[in-house]
Amino acid sequence: MTDVLRSLVRKISFNNSDNLQLKHKTSIQSNTALEKKKRKPDTIKKVSDVQVHHTVPNFNNSSEYINDIENLIISKLIDGGKEGIAVDHIEHANISDSKTDGKVANKHENISSKLSKEKVEKMINFDYRYIKTKERTIHKRVYKHDRKTDVDRKNHGGTIDISYPTTEVVGHGSFGVVVTTVIIETNQKVAIKKVLQDRRYKNRELETMKMLCHPNTVGLQYYFYEKDEEDEVYLNLVLDYMPQSLYQRLRHFVNLKMQMPRVEIKFYAYQLFKALNYLHNVPRICHRDIKPQNLLVDPTTFSFKICDFGSAKCLKPDQPNVSYICSRYYRAPELMFGATNYSNQVDVWSSACVIAELLLGKPLFSGESGIDQLVEIIKIMGIPTKDEISGMNPNYEDHVFPNIKPITLAEIFKAEDPDTLDLLTKTLKYHPCERLVPLQCLLSSYFDETKRCDTDTYVKAQNLRIFDFDVETELGHVPLVERPAIEERLKHFVSAPSSSL
């Protein structure tokens, strides 16, 4: 990439204060302090905004928290009293259902109310009632959502009728259940997510999905409500169907003791950043739970969609947010330092962790707790500088960490090409202001292989149309005078491996 183009990209990305509040220093506020503030609830409010299966760190006592980190660093990173740690001392936890939240849709506490095991079983049986009564077809009156115009027929007082065969439960967890079926009227396969609806609030995931219209985000087709015999209300989201999650795809190769093809990883990564570029700039939404289980793929076409918007939120600089968000292995360091005015860049960190996991076949950072997760990051990334610590939490800047020699990303990914290392290095940064934004990631030469006209990948790229951008929406945040150079780079195809800008 030319110096001029780099300058343009940096300028448009870091001067756009509406897109990212990068000029604002990350501010920290304890969760306890936030709870004491008397604020009116949001119009769209979730019952729970935290993942309840982890212990929340005590950010209120910063000295105690930072001392725990220092003690763990001393015990885990100082080998035999000597500075430094050998590369072969890295021990990533094996991927398992218990550590990585299992198969697709196994753990989605952020979607809605956390449900008991008995409640989930009841929801599953509630869907099976059609089978028990030998009904072959289910008929529902639903609200049809029009993605292009961002309206649904409920707003106009109208509904439509759909029918589908008895469903098959393909996933369930503390959030509810997911089933697959085929809409008879359209002959289209869909996934239906059923969650318990709290009557007091709007469902944030539903309201978020009404805002989305992008090929790399799972689409909302219909939604409807139904009651059980105890008069409890369930929201059903009828969504685009995808064959499997990225987690399941990775497990396929891990079980075969094979690596996922590098070009396949690049296709998924490109579409991930393309989706984030859209989310962060059009509806201005931060997903806040990017992980392999929430990324859906079709391996036959390399198509890709982000799902599960139960944690998604429009981040505003004047409104604090909970810091205990996002699954642990993919949680940005500022969140572990208790940041409440964080930016959309938490999604970029999570995305980099996903790419690294696809390359390694296991999580890059796999801590056993929140503090241990931070130690795992320090083990590889090194001790954060005073400025980086201040950017994550000013309360910690006077603490001095033990001096250790980190295991670098270059050591871990030494078998990968320089472009891969370059992208990971520039997205895995302690300070969110220093991370590439999604558009910068899309311009990386890491993706040039997917644009080569002399390979089979060119056909897949053309079929997916992943290099087609809607200028008014996906590039609408780019200043007019700078768009031509950006568009040229995004659509530039190369004919040989050595060719790059």
From Swiss-Prot:
The active site is at D289. Keywords: ATP-binding, Kinase, Nucleotide-binding, Phosphoprotein, Serine/threonine-protein kinase, Transferase. It catalyses: L-seryl-[protein] + ATP = O-phospho-L-seryl-[protein] + ADP + H(+); L-threonyl-[protein] + ATP = O-phospho-L-threonyl-[protein] + ADP + H(+). Transmembrane segments: none annotated. It comes from the Eukaryota. Its EC number is 2.7.11.1. InterPro entries: GSK-3, Kinase-like_dom_sf, Prot_kinase_dom, Protein_kinase_ATP_BS, Ser/Thr_kinase_AS, STKc_GSK3. ATP binds at V170, G171, H172, G173, S174, F175, G176, V177, V178, K193. GO terms for biological process: cell differentiation; regulation of protein catabolic process; signal transduction. It is an enzyme of class 2 (transferase). The modification Phosphoserine is found at S13. GO terms for molecular function: ATP binding; protein serine kinase activity; protein serine/threonine kinase activity; protein serine/threonine/tyrosine kinase activity. Coiled coil: none annotated. Disulfide bonds: none annotated. The keyword Methyltransferase does not apply. GO terms for cellular component: cytoplasm; nucleus. It holds the Pfam family Pkinase. Residues 164-447 form the Protein kinase domain. PANTHER family: GLYCOGEN SYNTHASE KINASE-3 ALPHA, PROTEIN KINASE SHAGGY-RELATED. Belongs to the protein kinase superfamily. CMGC Ser/Thr protein kinase family. GSK-3 subfamily. This is Serine/threonine-protein kinase MRK1. The gene is MRK1.
